[in-house]
């Protein structure tokens, strides 16, 4: 009886996630303030599709050691940020030859269920071979876009696969430099996808497609010679109407791509604007940013830089300005009080944090964001490099690609840092940090140089201190 009892207890622990060898729980978070405003984070860039959130009652400051670590989860290969909604956290990575979706409790990290499928892919440049696109959630259906261009719909309460589309087989998608990268976008009952298909004899293929969210049935397609980029499509209001913006352009000879403006319901093309570096080894990756009622900022880092576009009453595009020295690699810049802030540049040595005026694109300041850090008795000069920006409660937070996290005070005159900590020292920390219900989620994508930490997802207590 004793043996059976022990086995019974063991099974209970496994079911409840207490025997998860990859999960390490450090502490409990503070209670969430009753006055706190919280928001779901159902997709890449959040509810507002621009890297901003209305979360309030957040931690006012923190020391060099960083906010309190609540839990950490060892992960496989991935560049995907977590998705949080419906009281669940969804993590997407590659482990043991399988792309793996995990549903976990956001506060404890405990596993609720997982879903796996086999993939064969190896990044040709030696980067991570895991998924690039974050899961996208709408109601009770979650959409996955894997690194091999496999599109799947998963029911979040049962982990049941509802439908699956192989974009390579169905539309002739050819995996680009870094595999498939753009996250889908769910608009009403449609899943909008930057397909990047290739037609017969290299003719125009299905560039963008819409699928029924519940069945996966094709609803409409838009054909174009521009291939899939690493920029995720978004739907935003322009001149009072919802418009689908797709910044297309991946691996192709000759290099081509640019912004497509489409009706999300029908796929009708309003206009297209060519914006792509001439170099073969270039891609478009930064998500378009809508500014005001009728303007959109697009950028790339391989030579063209950034451009501000304006839509007229017929949704035709004209150029307001171009600035070759203001181009983001993949990060989404923030627009604050008629100024654009972002990490501009292609590679680590040439990246600078810059501020440009919306009105004319003039660059007001640039900062290399260098700082000193002691590692194993050695003084190192590090930077935020190709960092990410997150705006909450009118506060701006930045994650550097080597693991530094800080709060920025941004003005047209410059940048000041109010709190900063080196959470870890590891390269390729490119996923956008997420704040949900006062908890901060940060991804480490490569093995750390300090304490040999493995790739992991970390949850920090970012709730404000109690006033009692």
Per-region residue spans from a language model:
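Sec-dependent signal peptide recognition
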Residues: 2-10
């Amino acid at each position: 009886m004793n043996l059976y009892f022990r086995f019974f207890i063991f099974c209970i622990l496994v079911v409840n996630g207490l025997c998860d060898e990859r999960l390490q729980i450090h502490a409990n978070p503070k209670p969430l303030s009753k006055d706190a405003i919280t928001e779901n984070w159902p997709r890449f860039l959040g509810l507002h599709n621009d890297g901003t959130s209305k979360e309030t009652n957040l931690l006012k400051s923190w020391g060099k050691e960083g906010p309190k670590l609540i839990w950490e989860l060892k992960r496989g290969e991935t560049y995907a940020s977590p998705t949080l909604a419906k009281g669940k956290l969804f993590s997407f990575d590659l482990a043991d030859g399988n792309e793996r979706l995990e549903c976990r409790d956001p506060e404890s990290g405990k596993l609720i269920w997982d879903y796996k499928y086999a993939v064969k892919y190896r990044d040709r440049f030696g980067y991570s071979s895991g998924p690039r696109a974050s899961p996208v959630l709408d109601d009770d259906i979650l959409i996955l876009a894997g690194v091999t261009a496999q599109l799947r719909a998963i029911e979040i309460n049962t982990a049941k696969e509802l439908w699956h589309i192989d974009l390579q087989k169905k539309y002739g998608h050819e995996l680009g430099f870094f595999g498939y990268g753009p996250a889908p976008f769910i608009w009403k009952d449609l899943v909008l996808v930057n397909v990047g298909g290739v037609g017969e004899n290299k003719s125009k293929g299905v560039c963008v497609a819409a699928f029924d969210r519940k069945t996966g049935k094709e609803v409409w397609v838009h054909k174009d010679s521009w291939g899939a980029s690493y920029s995720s499509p978004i739907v935003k209001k322009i001149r009072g109407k919802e418009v689908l913006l797709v910044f297309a352009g991946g691996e192709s000879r000759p290099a081509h791509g640019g912004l497509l403006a489409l009706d999300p319901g029908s796929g009708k093309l309003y206009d297209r604007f060519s914006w792509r570096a001439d170099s073969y080894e270039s891609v478009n990756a930064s998500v378009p940013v809508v500014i005001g009622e009728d303007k959109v900022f697009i950028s790339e880092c391989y030579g063209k830089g950034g451009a501000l576009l304006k839509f007229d009453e017929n949704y035709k595009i004209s150029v307001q300005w171009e600035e070759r020295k203001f181009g983001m690699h993949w990060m989404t810049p923030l627009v604050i009080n008629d100024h654009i802030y972002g990490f501009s540049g292609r590679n680590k040595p040439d990246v600078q944090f810059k501020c440009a005026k919306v009105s004319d694109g003039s660059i007001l300041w640039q900062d290399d964001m260098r700082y000193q850090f002691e590692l194993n008795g050695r003084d190192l000069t590090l930077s935020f490099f190709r960092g990410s920006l997150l705006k909450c409660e009118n506060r701006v937070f930045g994650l550097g690609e080597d693991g530094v996290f800080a709060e920025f005070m941004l003005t047209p005159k410059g940048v000041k840092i109010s709190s900063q900590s080196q959470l870890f020292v590891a390269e390729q920390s490119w996923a956008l940090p997420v704040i949900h219900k006062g908890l901060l989620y940060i991804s480490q994508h490569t093995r750390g140089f300090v304490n040999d930490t493995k790739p992991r997802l970390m949850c920090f207590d970012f709730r404000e201190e109690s006033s009692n």
